[in-house]
Amino acid sequence: MHSGSADITTTSSVLPMITTPIWHYIDTNPAKWAQDTRYVTVFPDPVRRPGCCTTTEVTHMSRYFTKTLAALEPYTPGEQLKLPDLVKLNANENPYPPAPGVAAAVAGAVPGLRLYSDLTEAALCAAIARHCGVQPENILCGNGSDENLLLALRAFCDETHPLAFADITYSFYPVLCDLLHIPQHVILVEEDFSLDLSKYHGLNETIVIANPNAPTTLLQPVAAIEEVVRTNPDSIVIVDEAYIDFAGPNASCVPLTKKYDNVIVVQTFSKSHNLAGARVGFCVAIPELI
């Protein structure tokens, strides 16, 4: 036990339901918390998960980090309450259980987990291709759509070829840019949060457009995105369609991959397909890009 102001982290006991951020409960009297076995005082570090490094330990270990890693701000997820029948809008998880047939298929695949998976993911790519109306050679699977985005940026961006994206959009784009030393061209959204896609015409930069955009939910017509693709013939346009299945029919830009060689459409199984925990994503493009 130390003197001074105490921060709080949970022990293995179950933390009671708290809707107010836990730092509001930090008290200048450590003895008050010391009498409650549900909590353990930690000095001088901030609230953290049990088993994580302390601030002092991280500072000591950071001498090994690259400058890029040392400069990164850690990702702070939203509060993850473990309650039944809870719809977690902050995580955008599907609240409904999978169909019985899906659960049975997953259970039936368990014995095969002792074997390495097919590196080409041929069966999965074939099934996705049928669903999207393309050929298996147009599909590349990844560990969630984030890996597909990472691979695309590594392939088509560098210190001399920036990534252009909206200022209010998926927050992982700038993180990837920082990790890969990619310059960022941030394009402001309009007052109503819409995208003026004419600002993306002729940029000669790699472009990523979340459609529908997150968190604004606004959908761009396929024709408007096609004009971005058409006016950037020497650059890759990535269309991130994580939420496309909620946008209605004929909203996807997948058909553009049959018409243009510079467009990549990224989708995920995490949202409408109810497989966030499986981490399965894929992208659609011409075979030469795949």
Question: Whereabouts are the PLM-identified features?
Answer:
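Short catalytic/metal-binding and nucleic-acid-binding patches
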Residues: 1-60
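N-terminal "arm"/small-domain region of PLP-dependent enzymes with the aminotransferase-like
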Residues: 61-115, 202-203
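Phosphate-binding glycine-rich loop
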Residues: 121-162, 180
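Short, conserved active-site loop motifs that form the nucleotide-linked donor/cofactor pocket
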Residues: 139, 235, 262-263
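PLP-dependent aminotransferase-like
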Residues: 155-210
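Active-site phosphate-binding strand-loop segment of PLP-dependent enzymes
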Residues: 190-247
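Conserved core segment of the aminotransferase class I/II
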Residues: 259-290
